[in-house]
């Protein structure tokens, strides 16, 4: 049976688009890094907060908190936005609007969306460093 014949036409067009116009290798590597990091961190936080601590739903809250703390150089955002967090957010928006996005996104986006956004803005090296720190802390 020809599988293409049973796929919705919209999906066929999407697949053909990727076959004709493949993504750059660097972008593919970044996407793989993002997916791997997301899987690892969600797994670690789920085991710690849901399995060990029994606190349903707290895993994603702590993950977001730790991502922001890492990006803000260990300083709570209420004490100010550090240069590293500003640099990360300038990958997404104009430098003079960083403060607005950092604080405004808390009111308008879900926790999962904020986590996806932060991890997506991190470079591959920043994701690897974050995972290394998280594993070191959890294994204590």
Residue ranges: model-predicted function:
Residues 7-19:
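Short hydrophobic alpha-helical "box" of cullin-RING ligase substrate receptors
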């Amino acid at each position: 049976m020809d599988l293409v014949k049973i796929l919705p036409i919209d999906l066929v067009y999407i697949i053909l688009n990727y076959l004709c116009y493949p993504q750059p290798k660097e972008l593919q590597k970044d996407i793989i890094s993002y997916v791997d990091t997301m899987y690892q961190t969600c797994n670690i936080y789920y085991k710690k907060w849901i399995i060990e601590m029994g606190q349903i739903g707290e895993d994603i809250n702590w993950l977001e908190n730790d991502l922001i703390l890492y990006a803000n150089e260990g300083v709570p955002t209420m004490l100010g936005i550090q240069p590293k967090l500003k640099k990360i957010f300038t990958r997404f928006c104009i430098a003079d609007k960083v403060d607005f996005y950092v604080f405004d996104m808390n009111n308008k986006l879900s926790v999962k969306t904020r986590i996806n956004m932060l991890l997506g803005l991190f470079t591959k090296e920043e994701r690897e460093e974050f995972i290394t720190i998280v594993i070191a802390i959890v294994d204590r």
